[in-house]
Amino acid sequence: MRVSQSLVPFAIIALVLSFVNAYDPSPLQDFCVAIDDLKGVFVNGRFCKDPKRVDAKDFFFSGLNVPGNTNNQVGSNVTTVNVDQIPGLNTMGISLVRIDYAPHGQNPPHTHPRGSEILVLVEGTLYVGFVSSNQDNNRLFAKVLHPGDVFVFPIGMIHFQVNVGKIPAVAFAGLSSQNAGVITIANTVFGSNPPIYPELLARAFQLDASVVKELQAKFGSI
């Protein structure tokens, strides 16, 4: 599957726009290429590589043209390009992902605790949305996206995407952190290690404890 070349600029715009409100601390030097070396200078959660040893490969990644494998339980695949893939992103306050969706596949409800997200759809049809906080009465903000459409997910809000079309879908998203993190709600609540007390979850979700135990057995094995 090939992404239309005419839509690639939208992905680039999405990433550029994510620069505006980066949540990571601003750097005080040209760059701080991340390195696993305890002798380095510790900046923003990473040690800095000696600037004299930095080269172009520290700012490079190849592979976002390759579709991810969506043959899994949720029917989607996220290819992440953050500070772990590009060490030069350290202190830059940005990262990028490619998301592939099989027909009816989804990126299930999740949050990014350290960054907001701006997503551009380049192929297929997605139903996307986020839910606001308790103080805002948990309102759902959702739209059906078509190629070229853009949607923003505020930092920390539970959000999702699902492919409602008959063909595979592809999206790119920029995040306002070098490592925005991800908390998948179902996996976190029902697949924690060690498990949360079933009785607590049963009351919280108004479910029978046996249902909770079944969910914990399912998600605990993922």
Swiss-Prot record:
UniProt keyword list: Apoplast, Disulfide bond, Glycoprotein, Manganese, Metal-binding, Secreted, Signal
UniProt subcellular location: Secreted, Extracellular space, Apoplast
Disulfide bond positions: 32-48
Xref: InterPro entries: Cupin_1 (IPR006045), Germin (IPR001929), Germin_Mn-BS (IPR019780), RmlC-like_jellyroll (IPR014710), RmlC_Cupin_sf (IPR011051)
Any Gene Ontology CC annotation: extracellular matrix
Gene3D superfamilies: Jelly Rolls
Protein's recorded name: Germin-like protein subfamily 1 member 20
Source organism of the structure: Arabidopsis thaliana
Gene name of this polypeptide: GLP5A
